[in-house]
């Protein structure tokens, strides 16, 4: 059978007569096929619950819906045929109907003459013997022949039959749910007598059936696609469901039927399935129906239950059964893999056909699509949701101090009387912590309107307490106060330090007592001598005078030390004394410990490995850095890089020389410093041992702020530093802030890379609160959080801010600390790409930025910021548009107008030097476009293309100016005329001989160039200027051999030009004051020599050199003869 007819894709014509003859041959085996077909029907009806529940009339009329264009004509013929057949029916009585009826619904056409053929055939049977419709001479036969002759041209299409098995494959046909159409056609034959009663009823029924069929097709497409997606899983589910033997028998009978059909040829297959799906006469259908009901009573009952069940429950059951079966299959596969892993290779006989579970199809299930749809709708509602409706209506309670400390909160949705940020600051004010996602550590979920479904589901699964807005306020109101754990830790640390201080004086006193007896004996001897010499009164006075002096000295020393400590800054006062005290560097794999191990093993590693590393850089590097001669510490300021380097050197006993940005680090100064540091000895060695210490190798060089080596002061410093690293005999420690700086990229390959990260807020907070407790400064822990975040986690900046605020008052509240930290917020330098991203960014990042903050983005680099905005505003999807293209275009238009206004202001600033208009330009060029197009960028910010185009415009203008000057003696025209009228023709004249003649055309081109006084550079410039952008020039398409021949021919000859060929060189006479005198003298000598060479006559191209003849001239001979005579006369 044709698969296109099976699905009703095209309108089929009348069945040809040959097919009816073929069907007569297959009628003998029709009984057996019917039995199997009944089993198939039962199986299909169980799977296709949706189609079975529909009325039976619609399926019958499907043949009429896909009718040809001549429907009106056929209906008239049907009416006449019916009237004649009714007259004949009076004389004939139908006898027993035989099953071998060749006209019983054999035709596959969609026309109404099927009914005529059926009725006429039934009337022509007498005494149980069927008369041949082609041999009889009755009126019915005449009517049949008239109808056939009229309808033959309506079905001229001959279609090659295609089997369902060939189209879908054997497995798909076994499990196809679309065979429900055949059973419905059989059932619909019972209702044919009702449609014959009245012609008007037939027309009305046709119209109704057309509408019903269209609706059914609309709903059937989606179901058909889903059944195709679930074809491979359905049979397994039905096997699991059916425990009765009848289900197994039906499935096996279907398989037997299919195996028989496969043995035959493809046309036989088509006939077999076409006869199986055709309907037959009412009497025969009644018998077949009764036999089916008798054979399969349980399946008919099961079919009724399936028809009564709703669609949704059936689909859910199918999906659940499918998931269970796929899960069981995966478990079985995993178990088989484990067994096969334990078995030897010879026993691995598991077939690969078992791995048929379609994982990709499960991801495209209806549940997943529904989830995606709901997530999309939730996100859209999140973007469009309203703010608090009763803002400020509820009184915010005042809770106890640190009442929420140790509790973690998550806020979701919109709170009605308070903003989200205010709720977050309220929780943090009382010591609580607010996170973004629900986890096991979350104590409370504060839920508002339009809350997130995933957070609420996760909180319910983890057993997290859910609060509303009132519940949060009641919790703050009722929770008791707590003492901060940071204060308790600071007190414990203070007690430990006091106990240490109390123990240390006792040790000193014991040491003094041990040493004092020898001194006392010497002093007693002196006292005796003085007593003998002097009177006792004098000795008493001396003793009395010496004792108070010693006391005064101790007191003054203590007072001086206390005064010095008070004068010190907190940064120096609480500077770490050991590596353990550095914040954020306590771990074993921290950068401080890595540097310590690297420096300890620096002299142990062989110099060959270090040379190899210096040559090949990253390729020879190791995790411990043993192959590097230098280390590079990079990270943000205030994280302890310099402190780490100095403490590591002190701990290992290295003496170090530090060069920072305040020192001159040029090429010569680096040589001198390194040479001195290699030969120097520390003065500390003279005190430890009496003799002068020998020169040791335990020296180190610390180069701080390497990325700041620029300008005339440090010219050549980076290259000299790299050279020192290659040949150094001492370790070098370099430090920088920006590791991605262009100057550092070459240095990175020769250094052990150690990247410092900012410490966490908790690490900094505990150390700062202990320092504040020692200084008597009362700061609540939430206020300390704000101070640390305001300083961008810079430990040095936090200490400076604390010392400054402590000078005013010894207590800080949360609000005061938050306000002060915002005012003292550290300014961070942003690049142009970061500025552009922030100008158009939407969300929390820019939600609280004021107008001044937005205009400050413009002032990061006011010369290039407008260009970045103009280049990237087209790549932003604005939130205000909401996906509407018309609104998007309106916003683009307004942003473009604002950028144009900003350009007009910039023109006024540059032309009239009116720099007071810069804030106005900031509003037009940055703030307004950012507000209009605030949204999400679809790509990384791109560099302004205007800069490249402006540069190429200037270059081309300069080239055209030079060309017009060189050709002025021939063209006598302006620059514009040369550009528009001459260059294109000159280009063609220069390239055409080379393309047509090849190497031989080079001389012709050179002659033309000499005519117009053009140089080789002018030739290349003409090719560049006269070709359109992006397209290759005509000269570039030439053969390389021709180009080389042209270049050689041009260089052989001397070319005279009416203009001077001056080579512009940068004069180095005006050197900066930072250069040494030796270098400046060398530069001056080089410049004078170059000037003399330029002024020499021999080097001038316009003067022709004289060729010296081989014979000497007369004057030269006379001079030589005079010289010879003088020599002889002297002798």
From Swiss-Prot:
<dbReference type="GO" id="GO:0003677">
    <property type="term" value="F:DNA binding"/>
</dbReference>
<feature type="modified residue" description="Phosphoserine">
    <location>
        <position position="68"/>
    </location>
</feature>
<keyword id="KW-0235">DNA replication</keyword>
<dbReference type="Pfam" id="PF08519">
    <property type="entry name" value="RFC1"/>
</dbReference>
<dbReference type="InterPro" id="IPR047854">
    <property type="entry name" value="RFC_lid"/>
</dbReference>
<dbReference type="InterPro" id="IPR012178">
    <property type="entry name" value="RFC1"/>
</dbReference>
<dbReference type="GO" id="GO:0016887">
    <property type="term" value="F:ATP hydrolysis activity"/>
</dbReference>
<feature type="modified residue" description="Phosphoserine">
    <location>
        <position position="155"/>
    </location>
</feature>
<feature type="modified residue" description="Phosphoserine">
    <location>
        <position position="163"/>
    </location>
</feature>
<keyword id="KW-1017">Isopeptide bond</keyword>
<dbReference type="InterPro" id="IPR001357">
    <property type="entry name" value="BRCT_dom"/>
</dbReference>
<feature type="region of interest" description="Disordered">
    <location>
        <begin position="1073"/>
        <end position="1131"/>
    </location>
</feature>
<feature type="modified residue" description="Phosphoserine">
    <location>
        <position position="189"/>
    </location>
</feature>
<feature type="compositionally biased region" description="Basic and acidic residues">
    <location>
        <begin position="359"/>
        <end position="373"/>
    </location>
</feature>
<feature type="compositionally biased region" description="Basic and acidic residues">
    <location>
        <begin position="184"/>
        <end position="201"/>
    </location>
</feature>
<comment type="subunit">
    <text>Large subunit of the RFC complex, an heteropentameric complex consisting of RFC1 and four small subunits RFC2, RFC3, RFC4 and RFC5; the RFC complex interacts with PCNA and the interaction involves RFC1.</text>
</comment>
<feature type="region of interest" description="Disordered">
    <location>
        <begin position="120"/>
        <end position="201"/>
    </location>
</feature>
<dbReference type="GO" id="GO:0006261">
    <property type="term" value="P:DNA-templated DNA replication"/>
</dbReference>
<dbReference type="Pfam" id="PF00533">
    <property type="entry name" value="BRCT"/>
</dbReference>
<feature type="compositionally biased region" description="Acidic residues">
    <location>
        <begin position="1078"/>
        <end position="1088"/>
    </location>
</feature>
<feature type="region of interest" description="Disordered">
    <location>
        <begin position="92"/>
        <end position="111"/>
    </location>
</feature>
<dbReference type="GO" id="GO:0031391">
    <property type="term" value="C:Elg1 RFC-like complex"/>
</dbReference>
<keyword id="KW-0805">Transcription regulation</keyword>
<feature type="modified residue" description="Phosphothreonine">
    <location>
        <position position="160"/>
    </location>
</feature>
<feature type="modified residue" description="Phosphoserine">
    <location>
        <position position="309"/>
    </location>
</feature>
<dbReference type="Pfam" id="PF00004">
    <property type="entry name" value="AAA"/>
</dbReference>
<feature type="modified residue" description="Phosphoserine">
    <location>
        <position position="1090"/>
    </location>
</feature>
<keyword id="KW-0597">Phosphoprotein</keyword>
<feature type="modified residue" description="Phosphoserine">
    <location>
        <position position="250"/>
    </location>
</feature>
<dbReference type="InterPro" id="IPR036420">
    <property type="entry name" value="BRCT_dom_sf"/>
</dbReference>
<feature type="cross-link" description="Glycyl lysine isopeptide (Lys-Gly) (interchain with G-Cter in SUMO2)">
    <location>
        <position position="49"/>
    </location>
</feature>
<feature type="modified residue" description="Phosphoserine">
    <location>
        <position position="172"/>
    </location>
</feature>
<keyword id="KW-0832">Ubl conjugation</keyword>
<feature type="modified residue" description="Phosphoserine">
    <location>
        <position position="253"/>
    </location>
</feature>
<comment type="similarity">
    <text>Belongs to the activator 1 large subunit family.</text>
</comment>
<feature type="binding site">
    <location>
        <begin position="635"/>
        <end position="642"/>
    </location>
    <ligand>
        <name>ATP</name>
    </ligand>
</feature>
<dbReference type="GO" id="GO:0005663">
    <property type="term" value="C:DNA replication factor C complex"/>
</dbReference>
<dbReference type="Pfam" id="PF25361">
    <property type="entry name" value="AAA_lid_RFC1"/>
</dbReference>
<feature type="compositionally biased region" description="Basic and acidic residues">
    <location>
        <begin position="334"/>
        <end position="350"/>
    </location>
</feature>
<keyword id="KW-0067">ATP-binding</keyword>
<feature type="domain" description="BRCT">
    <location>
        <begin position="399"/>
        <end position="489"/>
    </location>
</feature>
<protein>
    <recommendedName>
        <fullName>Replication factor C subunit 1</fullName>
    </recommendedName>
</protein>
